[in-house]
A protein has these predicted regions:
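Short glycine-rich anion-binding loops that position phosphate/pyrophosphate groups of nucleotides
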Residues: 158
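Nucleotide/phosphate-binding catalytic cleft detector across ATP-hydrolyzing
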Residues: 1-42, 49-155, 165-277, 284-314
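Positively charged, low-complexity, intrinsically disordered RNA-binding extensions
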Residues: 161
Length: 319
């Protein structure tokens, strides 16, 4: 008789995490790199493809594919194949026993369309016997057992997903999504750096690493000084203001969506809801973000915001 394994998965634009009933948790960057030629293949130790951080590190020698955008699988054959390869890899990493019956729950953006969910189901069905696609912020709340009077904000690379949790499965009117997420911060930071320091040379990967290491919202953040080449010469730049502005851009659309979810809820429970806002996802680790959202909520009657523990696995744990 085959073993039964339950898995929860956060199939994210930037990172994919899996939690299994066998006690395994693992995360891989959502990138697949395919060898360009025989030299590339030799460089990769004879492998045709590599995954995650290794793929990004070898991006000059591979065809690098990032198959998800705004939390959804891109609808082209290259991306679908890359997701299949990525799922196969992460299942191998999770050491699921061969021949197991696999039941899975996959988190998706709060306002993902029916077609988008169908694409996730059809791709993942090659690896699982039964699958449910659920709202990613609801998965965070479910895993932490916050099932009533809670507003969950899941901040990923492609989307910021919000969900109003009130003791039932969320309906469409309980959910909101906006796209000023991690990728948008990267794009805005790159734009500001190009405008204010046109002589500096940098790549998208360098910008992402700066954000992940130093992201902060607030007027009292520590100075952020980084080194970029200028005509080949390493040169130091103070980018504190640019980074703060890029990160703060997430606050207004998030607060607007929160207030919309509060204002359209039963007035008797609105105060409880506004005082129980939960931040999850990789973007929740931005220093000062909880305080910035609280400060912005003062205009609407205030609120209390807290960050989940283990944001990397909060979604897959709940799923």
């Amino acid at each position: 008789m085959s073993d039964t394994v339950f898995i929860g998965m956060d199939l994210g634009t930037s990172r994919t995490s899996i939690t299994t009933s066998t006690g395994v948790r693992t995360t891989v960057w959502s990138y697949v790199g395919y060898a360009q030629d025989h030299v590339s293949r030799k460089h990769l130790g004879g492998r045709d493809k590599v995954f995650g951080e290794e793929a990004v590190e070898n991006r000059m020698a591979v065809n690098l594919v990032r198959p998800l955008d705004k939390g959804l699988i891109l609808d082209d054959e290259e991306s679908r194949q890359a997701v299949r390869d990525l799922l196969e890899h992460i299942f191998d990493e999770a050491s699921i026993p061969s021949g197991s019956t696999i039941y899975g729950v996959i988190g998706a953006p709060a306002e993902a369309s029916v077609d988008s969910k169908a694409l996730i189901l059809s791709t993942a069905s090659e690896f699982m016997d039964s699958i449910i696609v659920c709202s990613e912020p609801f998965a965070v709340a479910y895993g932490l057992d916050f099932l009533s009077d809670t507003l969950v904000v899941d901040i990923g690379a492609g989307t910021v997903d919000l969900c109003r949790v009130h003791g039932t499965m969320p309906k469409p009117e309980d959910q909101r999504t906006h796209h000023y997420a991690g990728d948008a911060i990267d794009a805005r930071l790159a734009e500001l750096l190009t405008k204010n320091h046109p002589e500096a040379q940098f790549s998208n990967n360098m910008v992402r690493e700066i954000k992940e290491n130093y992201a902060c919202v607030g007027t009292h953040m520590d100075p952020v000084k980084v080194t970029f080449p200028v005509k080949g010469k390493p040169t130091e730049f103070d980018i504190t203001a640019e980074l703060s502005e890029a990160c703060f851009g997430m606050v207004p659309p998030t607060v607007e969506a929160l207030q919309d979810l509060i204002a359209t809820f039963d007035p008797e429970f609105q105060q409880k809801m506004r005082n129980h806002v939960l931040l999850g996802g990789g973007g929740s680790q931005i220093t000062g973000l909880s305080r910035a959202i609280e400060d912005a909520l003062v205009e609407y009657g205030g609120g209390k915001v807290r960050q989940v523990e283990e944001p990397q696995y909060a979604g897959s744990n709940g799923a």
